A protein has these predicted regions:
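FIC/Doc superfamily catalytic core
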Residues: 1-258
Length: 258
């Protein structure tokens, strides 16, 4: 991607997205449900263990703490997302994780490249010296009037895409971007107790090939990014989770009246 011409501009084919949005509307009750399936329970906050095997448990503990913070900070009517919020989320997610050249809650100061040949190639994140400017523009864009007119799911997926595009941290960009998207859904009235509808599993199934391939297609097209296919893919994942909530609610109702 050619960074000197980068802008927060995108296009969406509403006609192609109509079936996805209709499926989303069909499960709207589940989006605001207060009773959620047991597999959405938070992992307990644990005392940090020692040794190499500690990393997955530390990530789980940190994710729980970060989700708690996001859930308290972002509610309908709360103040818009800020760069300070993003840095706090990253700090909470990265606590006690030893990552070379990274201080939790700070933007990277070195170049970064991500990707794989089998998933479309490699992507260079925003130039480090431009990150403070790009991140300021990012929060202005995400908190602006235009994204707020879109359905909440699309708004959150825009936030995810552009965050991943900038890749502002050495590590933890995926986890942070999903919680940024979660924050937007919270503000727009969704109950996302599980953290962006557990989209991590959906995005990264089959080694994340489809997810990364769609991202690279968008990046290779350049500005304005055609996000139709990526947004459709993301909505599919949200609908999949909402269906499981609907099934759970129906089961609870049957038991209540049975």
């Amino acid at each position: 991607m050619y960074w000197p011409s980068f802008e927060f501009r995108y296009s969406l084919d509403r006609r192609k997205l109509t079936p996805h949005l209709m499926a989303l509307d069909a499960h709207q009750q589940a989006a605001t449900a207060l009773v959620l399936p047991h597999h959405w329970n938070r992992p307990p906050a644990e005392t940090p263990p020692d040794g190499p095997s500690a990393i997955p448990r530390l990530k789980s503990r940190n994710a729980a703490r970060a989700r708690d913070w996001v859930g308290e900070r972002f509610v309908p009517g709360s103040s818009p997302l800020t760069l300070a919020d993003i840095l706090t989320i990253h700090r909470l997610l990265s606590e006690d994780l030893s990552v070379e050249h990274q201080t939790p809650g700070t933007l990277r100061v070195d170049p970064v490249q991500v990707g794989r040949a089998e998933a479309g190639g490699f992507h260079s994140g925003a130039p480090a010296e431009r990150l403070p400017i790009y991140m300021r523009r990012y929060v202005e864009f995400i908190a602006g009037n235009e994204p707020a007119t879109l359905p909440p799911a699309i708004h959150s997926l825009l936030a995810h895409f552009f965050f991943t595009t900038l890749h502002p941290f050495v590590d933890g960009n995926g986890r942070t971007s999903r919680l940024v998207a979660t924050a937007i859904l919270y503000q727009r009235g969704y109950n996302v107790h599980g953290g962006f509808y557990a989209l991590s599993d959906y995005f990264y199934q089959n080694d994340g090939i489809r997810y990364h391939t769609l991202l690279h297609r968008c990046w290779q097209q350049g500005v304005p990014f055609d996000l139709t296919e990526f947004v459709g893919f993301g909505i599919e994942g949200i609908v999949m989770e909402l269906r499981s909530i609907d099934s759970f609610i129906r089961m609870k109702l049957r038991r209540a009246v049975g």
